[in-house]
């Protein structure tokens, strides 16, 4: 019997660690959560607050011509009660009103006062010109104990016209003023309502009193209403102040027969200014452009949550206390367990798995290993490209939201309360709209930032893949296994986009042939082992059956079947 010995040899190819280059992005252990159009609470590496919540509790006036009215009410600068004597003419770009300020001395009110306040706040200061009115047959020196200087006096810019003697008839008079300047003029006059009919007769004589005022675009008649009223400043009478803006070359005419408080000077405005009502102190050592009743907002942010009635060059008021603007890429913190399990390249390519917390000098970068060791380097080109597109996002938001705000008070007269309610409702509605708009604007910018940074990562990955071509193989974790020896200079050429794949092509192709093209991962090893075992058993069984068949054929073995 011929004996044949068959030897089955199992050859295992062991692949040593190849040179590798991996791509990844910067990550931090604790990022900042922002909202995007599609998702809330997305963690990013960097974010900037866009809502200002801080304020300086002072009115900063450095570099400004500021005027603090103190006890003088804003409207008093036109009529001239004693407390406003030093403010009858001035120049300012910031007018500060105080709660203690009073517009009048003899009790009364300004008609349509809110509109007049707004005009004066924007005036930039005032200079004045005499009306040139002259009178005969009457007294022009009416005074009252309610307006005291060294003794009884009156409004500095007005003339209280009285009968020549008590109870004497007041003559019918007509006075006109023509505005000869090339700018509008503000004219104020008063209607005196006596405390009683007896007092009116004493001051202006008997009979009905009528005052008529007219210009090219204004016509109004006034009838005084004498009567008992509660005393204010020792007076039961009242003066209603009326006003009009007289255009250049226009003329206003006053016709009256008593109870008339005549203008002595008219007012002209100087440039532009801003007014603020506040009780906080003035600080000449700090600068500001945005003011509210609690102080100054000094911020370059596009939004603020300090005061809805801030005035000046202010951030938009929104209800949100925080709106974070992403200024960095999406953060996927490095996972320590993966790093321990897979070594240097365990936490590779953040756009696939997670980021690199050690990559601090760039947003994107490379890690490599070769015979000379391991290394990490930032990719400045892709980093700068992303930064260039993100830089200026805050400024663009500011450009979209910046607006000069003006103060509109809630101190409306009875006649103006409905207008005041409309203004307040409108202000609240605008706040609601801008709060929504701010949320949407920031979410859109955040979405764009995250998409942009992902795009730059993909561009870098594609750049490397196109360079290496068949000289390397992707491993689906952001790494490329290189099939040739790649020293530090070679790695640098890949990073710098100067790699020449043809130089290494022959070596790479030879090495690819030696390497089993099927890369076994732990998930497939058991399947291959069972397949190998089954194939070996089948081969042994086939050999045994072949030997039996040969023996039977040669007569060396007989098979008897019994039935």
Curated annotation (Swiss-Prot):
A lipid is attached at residues 559, 562 (S-palmitoyl cysteine). Keywords: Clathrin- and caveolin-independent endocytosis of virus by host, Clathrin-mediated endocytosis of virus by host, Disulfide bond, Fusion of virus membrane with host endosomal membrane, Fusion of virus membrane with host membrane, Glycoprotein, Hemagglutinin, Host cell membrane, Host membrane, Host-virus interaction, Lipoprotein, Membrane, Palmitate, Signal, Transmembrane, Transmembrane helix, Viral attachment to host cell, Viral envelope protein, Viral penetration into host cytoplasm, Virion, Virus endocytosis by host, Virus entry into host cell. Residues 548-563 are cytoplasmic. It is found in: Virion membrane; Host apical cell membrane. Disulfide bonds join 22-479, 60-286, 72-84, 105-147, 290-314, 486-490. GO terms for biological process: clathrin-dependent endocytosis of virus by host cell; fusion of virus membrane with host endosome membrane; fusion of virus membrane with host plasma membrane; viral budding from plasma membrane; virion attachment to host cell. The keyword rRNA-binding does not apply. It comes from the Viruses. Homotrimer of disulfide-linked HA1-HA2. Belongs to the influenza viruses hemagglutinin family. GO terms for cellular component: host cell plasma membrane; membrane; viral envelope; virion membrane. Residues 1-18 form the signal peptide. Glycans are attached at residues 30, 46, 249, 424, 496. The chain crosses the membrane at residues 527-547. Binds to sialic acid-containing receptors on the cell surface, bringing about the attachment of the virus particle to the cell. This attachment induces virion internalization of about two third of the virus particles through clathrin-dependent endocytosis and about one third through a clathrin- and caveolin-independent pathway. Plays a major role in the determination of host range restriction and virulence. Class I viral fusion protein. The keyword Repressor does not apply. The extent of infection into host organism is determined by HA. Influenza viruses bud from the apical surface of polarized epithelial cells (e.g. bronchial epithelial cells) into lumen of lungs and are therefore usually pneumotropic. The reason is that HA is cleaved by tryptase clara which is restricted to lungs. However, HAs of H5 and H7 pantropic avian viruses subtypes can be cleaved by furin and subtilisin-type enzymes, allowing the virus to grow in other organs than lungs. This is Hemagglutinin.
């Amino acid at each position: 019997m011929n004996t044949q010995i068959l030897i089955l040899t199992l050859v295992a190819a062991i692949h040593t660690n190849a040179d590798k280059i991996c791509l990844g992005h910067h990550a931090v252990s604790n990022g900042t959560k922002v909202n995007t159009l599609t998702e809330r609470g997305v963690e990013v590496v960097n974010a900037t607050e866009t809502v200002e919540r801080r304020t300086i509790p002072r009115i900063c006036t450095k570099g400004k011509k500021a005027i603090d009215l103190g006890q003088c009410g804003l409207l008093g600068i036109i009529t001239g009660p004693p407390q406003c004597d030093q403010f009858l003419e001035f120049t300012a770009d910031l007018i500060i009103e105080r709660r203690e300020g009073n517009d009048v001395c003899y009790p009364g009110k300004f008609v349509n006062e809110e509109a007049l306040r707004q005009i004066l706040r924007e005036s930039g200061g005032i200079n004045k010109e005499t009306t040139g009115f002259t009178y005969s047959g009457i007294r022009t020196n009416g005074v009252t104990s309610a307006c005291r200087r060294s003794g009884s006096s009156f409004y500095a810019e007005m003339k209280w016209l009285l009968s020549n003697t008590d109870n004497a008839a007041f003559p019918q008079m007509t006075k006109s003023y023509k505005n000869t300047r090339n700018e509008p003029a503000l004219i104020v006059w008063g209607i005196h309502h006596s405390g009683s009919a007896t007092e009116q007769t004493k001051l202006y004589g008997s009979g009905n009193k009528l005052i008529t005022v007219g210009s090219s675009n204004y016509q109004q008649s006034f009838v005084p209403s004498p009567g008992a009223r509660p005393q204010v400043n020792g007076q039961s009478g009242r003066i209603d102040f009326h006003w009009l803006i007289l255009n250049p070359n226009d003329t206003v005419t006053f016709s009256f027969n008593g109870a008339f408080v005549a203008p002595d000077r008219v007012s002209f405005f100087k440039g532009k200014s801003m007014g603020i009502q506040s009780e906080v102190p003035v600080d000449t050592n700090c600068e500001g452009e945005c003011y509210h009743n609690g102080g100054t907002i000094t911020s370059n942010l596009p939004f603020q949550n300090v005061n809805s009635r801030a005035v000046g060059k202010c951030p938009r008021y929104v209800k949100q206390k925080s709106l974070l603007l992403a200024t960095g890429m999406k953060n996927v913190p490095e996972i320590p367990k993966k790093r321990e399990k897979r070594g240097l390249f365990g936490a590779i390519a953040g756009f696939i798995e997670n980021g690199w917390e050690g990559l601090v000098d760039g947003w994107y970068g490379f890690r490599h290993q070769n015979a000379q060791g391991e290394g990490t380097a930032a990719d400045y080109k892709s980093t700068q490209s992303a930064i260039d597109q993100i830089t200026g996002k805050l400024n663009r938001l500011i450009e979209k939201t910046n607006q000069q705000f003006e103060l509109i008070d809630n101190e409306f007269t009875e006649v103006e309360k409905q207008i005041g309610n409309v203004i307040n409702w409108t202000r609240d509605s605008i706040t609601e709209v801008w709060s929504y708009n701010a949320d949407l604007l920031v979410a859109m910018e955040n979405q764009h930032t995250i998409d942009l940074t992902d795009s730059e990562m993909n561009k870098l990955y594609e750049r490397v893949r196109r360079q290496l071509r068949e000289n390397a193989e992707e491993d689906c974790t952001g790494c490329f296994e290189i099939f040739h020896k790649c020293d530090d200079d070679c790695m640098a050429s890949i990073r710098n986009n100067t790699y020449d794949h043809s130089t290494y092509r022959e070596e790479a192709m030879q090495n690819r042939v030696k390497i089993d093209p099927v890369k076994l991962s732990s998930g497939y090893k058991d399947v291959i082992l069972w397949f190998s075992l089954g194939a070996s058993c089948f081969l042994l069984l086939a050999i045994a059956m072949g030997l039996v068949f040969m023996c039977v054929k040669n007569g060396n073995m007989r098979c008897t079947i019994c039935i």
